[in-house]
Amino acid sequence: MKRTWQPNRRKRAKTHGFRARMKTKSGRKVLKRRRQKGRHRLTV
């Protein structure tokens, strides 16, 4: 059986990257929450 984690840097950034988060309203909410929480890394 194929494993679920097939590393791919490009896909990772395109799905969870900063610009991907900024594109949608909900993504911006994610960043807002993470800033509020004080995360050092907002995105991947």
UniProtKB/Swiss-Prot annotation:
Pfam families to which the protein is assigned, alphabetical: Ribosomal_L34
Segments of this protein annotated with the region Disordered: 1-44
Keyword Membrane set for record: no
Organism annotation: Thermus filiformis
Other noteworthy facts: The open reading frame (ORF) for this protein is entirely within the ORF for the RNase P protein (RnaP). The two start codons are separated by four nucleotides.
Superkingdom field: Bacteria
GO CC annotation: ribonucleoprotein complex; ribosome
Keyword DNA repair annotated: no
GO MF annotation list: structural constituent of ribosome
Protein name (record): Large ribosomal subunit protein bL34
GO BP term, example: translation
